[in-house]
Amino acid sequence: MKDKTLLMIPGPTPVPENVLLEMAKAPVPHRSSEFSAIFDEVNENLKWIFQTKNDVFIFASSGTGAMEAALSNLVNAGDKVLSLVIGNFGERWAKIAESHGAIAERLSVPYGEVINPADLKKRLDEDVNKEIKIVTL
């Protein structure tokens, strides 16, 4: 493979040559028993990787697409979302929440720092009416 650029970003990621060669083959039909068997095996392996007995979900999308799907199913217009912002992804959660009509409150720290758990606890304790529907990070 000629292009051996090392990408140090969230995505896209480098794809090994053997995977690229497999992708050049005809796809397995997604309604076939062969696909079902592969899908089940992948799900079981993901459970092992994540050390869980719970269901895992494969989402054919970018990370932002998964964030959109999560918030569109968890918040309604007018709901309050507390977004922990320590960088671009935390800010993205807030913007996506706002795009769905939610009210995004940001608990932010400068890039490279971390949110103090005591500050988060304090903010949640202040929410005596339980208006915050979800916390994003």
Where are these regions (language model features)?
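Hydrophobic N-terminal alpha-helices or hydrophobic patches in metabolic proteins across all domains
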Residues: 1-2, 7, 31-32, 110, ...
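General beta-strand structural signal in soluble alpha/beta enzymes
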Residues: 7-9, 57-60, 83, 106-107, ...
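Active-site phosphate-binding strand-loop segment of PLP-dependent enzymes
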Residues: 115-137
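Glycine-rich phosphate/diphosphate-binding loops that line cofactor/substrate pockets in enzymes
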Residues: 49-50, 72-79, 124-131
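Active-site-proximal loop->helix
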Residues: 92-103, 110, 121-123
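Conserved beta-loop-alpha segment that forms the PLP phosphate-binding cup at the N-terminus of a helix
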Residues: 53-86, 90-94
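A glycine-/small-polar-enriched, mobile loop at the entrance of the PLP active site in fold-type I
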Residues: 4-60, 64
